[in-house]
Amino acid sequence: MPNAAEIVPDYLLIGHITHDVTPYGPHLGGTVSFAAHTAAAFGLKVALLTSAAPDEPLMERLPDSVMVVNIPAEHTTTFENIYTPDGRVQYMYHRARTLEVSMLPPAWRNARQVHFAPVAYEVDPAFADVFADTPLCVTPQGWMREREADGRVRQVHWSAAGQVLPRADLTVLSVEDIRHDPGLEAEFAALAPVMVMTRAEKGGTVYVNGEPRDYDAYPAEQVDPTGAGDVFATALHIVRHQLDDLWRALDVAARLAANSVTRRGFAGAPTPDEVAQALAAVGAPGKR
């Protein structure tokens, strides 16, 4: 049986899993975690390049089918959100290793789709050169933050945006990601061939070569919004590649994101049946 590092993935994720400190105990977090669950529901061969403590028990909460290369670190990237009368304060207590091109298994360079999903400025922008000819999704929130000496996370200017965004087939971010500088919406839309700015239950805006077009979200009874944006971005990237149709892919992604907020944690990731139903709703066959 071949080693996972020798298998060409359908969907390659690059970014840190995270240990999220919550009042209910530790939770597995990170965009790659929700994205892995989503891509697996599409029946794809999913691979993850990450860095975490070698004995991190939270890794067991990833789907069993996901092929993982974990670059061992002293600690897993660890976040905690503290809610105050003045709003949320985020702390990053630990950060695992920076992910570099040399860490990538050679076979994974031939992945059919790639998703850069940094949460702690951990993905080397040089990966964009490696995947210049591969359908690439970028969810850039983790490149727009840094950790201060006391662990507090602050928003910063993303200096490599001009290197990465023009190479990406799809860029997805939320209004929360740019709350510190709303002008970044226009700046990034001018760099990215296709960019989606999500606005939670209000839908969002799609920019194609800088031209905006709004879309609506599907209504849903919200229970837990965690991970819905990751479900949306991953589904949009996958279905756009399958159908070569941005607008039908957007509809599928919006349906799955609406389902996601009605359940807690990874239960919000789509099921294979939900994927099939969403594809059928836009007249597309399932890709199981």
Mark where each language-model region is:
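Conserved beta-alpha-beta core of the PfkB/ribokinase-like small-molecule kinase fold
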Residues: 113-186, 202
